[in-house]
Amino acid sequence: MHTKDLTTGSPMKLILSFMLPLVFGLLFQQVYSMVDTIVVGKFLGVDALAGVGSTGSITFLVLGLCNGVCAGFAIPVAQKFGQRDFDGLRRFVGNMIWLSCVIAAAVTLVTTLLCRQILLWMDTPADTFSYAYDYIFVIFLGIPATMLYNLLSGILRSLGDSKTPLVFLIMCSLLNVALDIVFILTLNMGVAGAGWATLLSQLISGVLCLYFIVKKFPILHLKRDDLRLRKIYVRKLLNMGLPMGLQYSITAVGSILLQTAVNGLGATAMAAIAAGSRVSMLLVCPFDAMGTTAATFAGQNLGAGKLDRIHQGVKDCTVLGIIISAAIFVITWFGGSAMTTLFLDTADGASVDMVVPMGHQFLIINAAFAVPLLFVNLLRFTIQGLGYSEFAVFAGVFEMVARGAFGLCLVPVLGYTAACFASPAAWVMADLFLFPAYFHCMKKQGYSFKPTKVSAATE
């Protein structure tokens, strides 16, 4: 069993040791996501790339809801682990299994039935519509597989094990690459093949994760009584999971409004943002990993009653995040064009000449605002680890308003440049809420921000 106690020892060392496997895992996850896009762009053309890219915001809305719920469900597990209440831990796991099955079934049914209408509402251009529909329908069919992996990996991380999910994710990534090549290049399945490759690889990753838990984690071996639904546990799980899921979905609504506006700019702009977004998501993987680490670190230390360690962890992550932000900007400045070119068919010179400069512009603008994005992830997830998931919803509202305003008001007037500034504006808006929210939540838990000895945070 590979659990890790985050309530003792140096916060910085613990954060780094927990975070690094997450970074590698997210990098692999983004790589196999990028493979879909690269293969589609190079072998199926710009219209296919634009079609797949245009589904990003609606996919983020739906999968963000599911993944956010899973992340929220894992927080009470981390808190119980910090308290060393293993009976309560298993009851939470048993109740979250039932809730996850219901949510996965409901979301899959609704999204597969409505995905065509959703694309119509988003004004998806006719020349990219079929590509978008073929891809997103398969992705929605795979929601149960996505939730299976995210639920199980979230449970393992809440116990301090960030390495086991990494191993299975690497295997999943390599399988995804192989299936992409087989389905698209050999079987000529088109963009649907990319979707099926993602679905099957996630399913296999989830099943392997389940097998490992059964074999190696006796702390998670459930009895019949653990699977009994209990109102107090269901209420706690829903109070944590639904706000986190809604936070992602609310944020995605703004992205959908923005994507709708971008769709009106044509296939070239759509392809540039699709390629730029993929590269950007790869570069900011450390921030995503930091957020997951912060939630687990805060959850365990809250359970142990060590609020001073939580604040020290936030300060350590801030220093680390600023260094990462500088590296992201340097990489983007010198390598952004080359990375954007990966997604395009270089034989189509006209498309490359138009899309690459626009994609690089998108990357530079977003990289310049990496520090605000750092705090969005760090503070939001720390607040969630403290048990205040409802604040994540409000942060999502701020992001939605900013992206929606750019999409509805500025993109039609200022064009592509306004679309590039939409996400940075959303991050800044969210930070204006998250900073006071963090201090409020810590004080509400009884923490005083008066200077303390360093040893108090690290003992």
Language model regions located:
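Small-residue-rich hydrophobic transmembrane alpha-helices
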Residues: L49-L109, T146-P165, A272-G336, L373-G387, ...
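Short runs within selected transmembrane alpha-helices of multi-pass transporters and secretion channels
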Residues: C70, I139-R157, P165-S173, A194-V207, ...
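Hydrophobic transmembrane alpha-helices of multi-pass small-molecule transporters
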Residues: L61-G64, T108, N176-D180, G206-L210, ...
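Transmembrane helical elements of multi-pass membrane transporters/channels
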Residues: S17-D36, V138, Y149, C172, ...
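N-terminal transmembrane alpha-helices
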Residues: L6-F43, S57-G72, P76, C101-T108, ...
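Interfacial/gating helices of multi-pass transporter permease domains
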Residues: V40-F60, A126-Y131, V191-A192, Y233-M240, ...
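Helix-terminus/linker motif at the lipid-water interface of multi-pass membrane proteins
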Residues: L27, V31-L49, L119-A126, V182-M189, ...
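Short alpha-helical transmembrane segments in multi-pass integral membrane proteins
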Residues: M1-M19, V77-G142, T186-L242, A298-F369, ...
